[in-house]
């Protein structure tokens, strides 16, 4: 059966199921036999007066139970209620649950409820955590790490939020700290901080750092995300940070430096971070400051004194403020600073000081957001953000750079400077709900971005020697200095309808339009998703969706023809005679404007909550990408003369399929255990990455993507232990990532991804005890990362002609960890 017919048939079947569900579930829960005249409007706000959407409402009177969920404006109206006294329970994950025992319908037409965000250290002992729930209004395939999970679960580099994301199934991290969601490349992911784009505008990488202690939650959406999100086919990473309230609060983490026993007792690193928050004016204005500092000293045992040390420092701070101009008009501003510098970066036994780099990079984000609620029920949210990214890479000196199988010598061959800016303007409008064959909530919005980018390179010739010291290759650059610049303008708009024919069925349909000055064509992205509550108790849900997604134009890929050329001169075994003319490496843009990379995604899921506070989730997702951006090498045979004349092409095709099962159990006292298994396949017909700095003299070819992990088991949690301690753990096992084999001429040997790293396994354990000292609440943790000492490698010598072929490096091994946190004053 042709593919389009199969998909059409699936769509018809699904719509038929929805139609039947409307007829079966068309009668709302409530009091169907009695005439009703009363109504109750529930308004849910947080402690700062911001509307809380998707809050679960349970209204009970005797044996009658009514359920509802707040809309975008934090409102929900219970209609046709008999007068009387009710109990109202309000819950949402990430907030403390709240119960109003006496809500008198008939005496009041509305009730305003304040939900407080969960905090690690609270003044009251009678608070109740909102348990994981089956959310009838969530059609997106999304997963959340809340503040408790981010702080309690042990993982590598707990000061970097990117290392927490692999705690979610479907999310893997590569050796360069970059994140991949459901088989996607990092640049196919949209990263946002409090609703603003923080993705690097050139590379598409996630490089911005935020103080982990300031993060309230991280939401990862991998499929079925609505049309308000675009410019990403891989998924959405949404970081949400906190805000002060009417109490002054402070916290501090890792404020004591650590030491190391290398060449005597030496300073190792110091990574303090803290948060300070409180009112500027109680009930109306608040602030948050979240500074962090990192200083590292790297000592290499094998190097001589005076040439054995590298240092790195980093400073970051998030400053936020919120002012409620009126209860219906809220203004929020923020300023994020990242600044780091590394001296002698890359220092190792194989890379002496003279061959290292001095690295400097910075990122800045300035935002302003206005939220207005109008009396007619309209919600208007406007935003303005400016961001800047700067990267510099400076070698030490100007000595000729020489690469040997055992060590490098001289000064690194390349100097680079890069600057990029993004100006972002957003506007979103939520219209009042409309009753027409059910309830409709309409949302429209726009996103306008202006991106500028410039980069310069200064490259010097370098040589590559064989094991016996003879010259194998000499590399020269026709233009030692290269400068490039590229700008882009992006315009987006969307319209979305959330239709609830009944209290058990939700259909979310929308369309998105995108245009930019590189592709220069209007991109239309229709999407459809729905959720159906299979049981009246709200504990079982079926969800499915299909949609078209486009990637943002990647300036790094499209600008490669401007990045310069290089010539490789190959020598015979004696290192004296040239084997032929030099091989030129160049990139060329094809004719006409490129097409936008496009994906068609569809997925289906089943969720169920057992009475024992156990939550089960099953899911299947399929992604099919086409028109992907890549470069092709015209050489067609591995025996043909070396060639590196790369031509831009829209011929990349990516495939991803995955089945996932996960379970979560919550214990009394907010302890929990999570486990999941994912079976997946991530492949492409173009997996070879070509670049001027590291060319591959082979044709483009297909195979598994470098982050493909067909089998993965993941588990983590924290449980009560002896002596009032909590035992926390994380366990991650997955198939090793694939890698390609090359020869000394940088030609592929066999198909790409023909070999794999050993299976990855890491078990992290930690014990934490909370106690009071001098009136302050503290938490002391000690544990081990990779307690089994698995020695998971990050890199491999993939040169089949190298005497160290298949030698693994980048091995961490077992690491003792400790953490001291000041939670506040008791």
Show the residue positions of the predicted features.
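Periplasmic N-terminal accessory/gating domains of Gram-negative outer-membrane beta-barrel systems
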Residues: 96-114, 123-243, 253-265, 269-275, ...
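C-terminal beta-signal and adjacent terminal beta-strands/loops
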Residues: 613, 724-745, 768-826
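Solvent-exposed loop/turn elements at secondary-structure boundaries
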Residues: 529-647, 758
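Transmembrane beta-barrel strands of outer-membrane/channel proteins
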Residues: 129, 250-258, 289-295, 333-337, ...
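Gram-negative outer-membrane beta-barrel transporters
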Residues: 617-742
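Transmembrane beta-barrel wall of Gram-negative outer-membrane proteins
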Residues: 266-341, 358-381, 526, 676
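Periplasm-facing N-terminal accessory domains of Gram-negative outer-membrane beta-barrel systems
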Residues: 18, 22-146, 199
